[in-house]
Amino acid sequence: MSTKKTKSPSKKASKKATGKKPSAPSVAKGSKSSYAKAGVDVALGNRVKSGIGALVRPTHGAEVLGGIGGFGGLFRPDFKKRGIKDPVLVSSVDGVGTKLKIAFATDNHDTIGADLVNHCVNDIAVTGAMPLFFLDYIAAAKLDPRVLKEIITGLSRACKEARCALIGGETAQMPGLYGEGEYDLAGSITGIVDRKDLLDGSRVKPGDALVGLPSNGLHTNGYSLARKVLFDLLGLKLSDRPAGLGTTVGAELLKVHRSYLPTFRKLHAMKGKPLHAAAHITGGGLIDNLPRILPKGCDAVIDPGSWKVPAIFGIIGRGGNVDPLEMYQVFNMGIGMVLVVPGKEGEKIAKTLGGKVIGGVVKGSGIVRFFPEPGN
């Protein structure tokens, strides 16, 4: 058997033979690939994704290694610069849910990415973590260059505001799975916290105060019920302005999920580290999210009259004849984040952060109680 190594034609030889600069193999110009005929246009996908790098690069810092397009995003955290001695990584993954339907209907896609990033940022912030990096997932029947650019722009803007690097993602074409003009959007975030600063609910005790931070609307939860009531039962249009709402239905439903990261940065800088725990009020509302941070032997008692509930929730509750307690289990009802702090510091912290003391922690069995019972 011959052991002589066979040489492959060099680029120089190839160019000399053909008189042309060699290029990557591709389907003949003017013809359509079999894959494209099946609904997946690889060439279109490559063209669409070619401009992503310029959009996400502003989110990168010295800790990001390499660029976009590799098999994996590379991130080397500088623990020393961050002042972290015993690092704990915190990860979360989420989607935007049926709020996407509003983006489709209004053809407005530049805020939905911020919804996703802010939701994920808040989810890890309640553990005491600060964001490191983010990855996104976008899937559609067919990629629309304009829509994709708007989505990525929103993602990048929110990541930059959160000091979080957008280091990669997946963009998939799935014909037959999604409707024309529709897509799905999800993302994963990883953050970091020093173990001594980890918030896990263990510091919560009877006598603590509950400080509620205001939401600006539905955020990213309860849209299936909201759409059912507003559009099917009440017959409203996106351009309608119901009494008391102050804006159109479409504008109200597209309000960007608020990021509470600036508030957490302020809290971490306070003397004495007053934050005992925090709960992001998302799907499940106050009723299901507060128990996630309550230790055994503690209940959360909420006064639903201690803050002003935004008009949109009243419109949905009355319009759909929804049980008042169910409203507090589906929607945030105007409270997007709850902080657990020492009772004697509750009012001061609430005033400093623009929130309200909405209740307190008492002895109990790990549930949420309302006093008085909420009503529409």
Placement of each model-derived feature along the sequence:
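Glycine-rich phosphate/pyrophosphate-binding loop regions near the starts of catalytic domains
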Residues: 43, 54-216
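A generic structural signal for residues located within well-ordered alpha-helices
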Residues: 40, 44, 112, 221, ...
